[in-house]
């Protein structure tokens, strides 16, 4: 008997039985080869099927050749794509998992490939990031596109696929754009009223049914609420879902938000679990077909509670399945603590729009999670118990080496413990616990309160291959240390020093912004005891390395809390009581501050180790993100 009976109960979708309620939603991978299914893509989805997922909805699959969504996404606009799709379907089906293709026309969201004609849209209204205005699609073009959707679905069916998803959520792509009043300003039969805006979607559904028959699954993805003034509301979408049911849709996939309001469709760290479940719950009351919800369902118990409490019938679990391909199997077997924790950082998709492959902060091997045994077994010493050190120790031990990890402090985690302190970063604590648990499980010898000395290297560890993960130290600016009360962000987050009430944070990267957020009052209510915080950033961009949703959410919080943000602000001098900066050629002086916090980056703390075989990993080699540290350590250890 598993601990999640509702989650692992089979469900009927149309005329198809799905083995459990864990569905995987579409997540772009950029693994396709000019639209064709590549072997890596087959392996990627097959791994999630092997991991126990009941049904997979693939990333977007374009239905016509003119407009490309992402260079590495799939297409199925002619029969040449069918053989690759058959390999993909067969790879997933061998594990009893069902697979749907998310059919998509990018329209005004197309990638700017050279030679692409003017983009089409419902109206001459494009997204905020568009380089030029789109043109309204003609009725003749819409009729052609409707037929292209039907033909594309039929190719999926020929390849053995179980169905298709029609993407109408997030004001995303042609169909999502037609449905939302934010983009659809038409006055013909495809606009005006909600029925008019829904017409194109209903015609696409009818086209798919015409080509594929009644046994083929059709699901439609919608935003239960766009959370935007003038956008689609929950009441609108209840009506829409009733019409979708009448049109023969087999289930509804309820997301939320849109592409206009950043962070609304893909929730950032710190967001409450299942933020769209209130919409799916209400929609479920008005239709007689299954309803799925999605977003931040990162633990099995959350999914179980959602289904048990009739918030939804199925849970779309995306990023956690990316983070751990065995998510479903581990949940079923009761090995919940062994699930690699998704922290919701969004870095999996950060590079997608630049054409990079999908990746994960916590899982350095998204495509292939296997660790091959070493041909020659060695003795390995890992110096430093931060995330890079723990990853290296785990991988080396997993490969069959004898591993000792020495950490000079009394606990493992390193810089990750400080990173977990700011608001919305608490899920990093799960990563620390997970990494420690793996070391225990593999039997890595961990020595705390142990600083490795030259004598130890010359004697006890003389035959060991050395992996040094000594981390980094926060940078300071010596001329500015004349200020009456200065400290680093690390000093604040570790509790070593306590700031005053009128604070200047120097540096608008992730650490500076998170520290300002941590220190600011929860609400800007002008309470006399509230801290006053000024953040100075010398460039025109906050948190350049942060994921879009996380960056948007944190920036909004800083503004709501009344943090004064000055971009393009170059600090030129500091004395005991005054901080002087220049912005747009004008000099400004801050005289009322009582604390100056340095958040200006980190410098590698490279400890030179005198030994034959030494590998430097993580921040001590090159300061970077958590993802950089774990990935670097993983790759080094795989080659020892």
Segment roles from a protein language model:
Residues 287, 310-311, 442, 482, ...:
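Short, structured coil segments at secondary-structure junctions
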Residues 24, 252, 407, 466-467, ...:
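Hydrophobic beta-strand scaffold positions of dinucleotide-using enzymes
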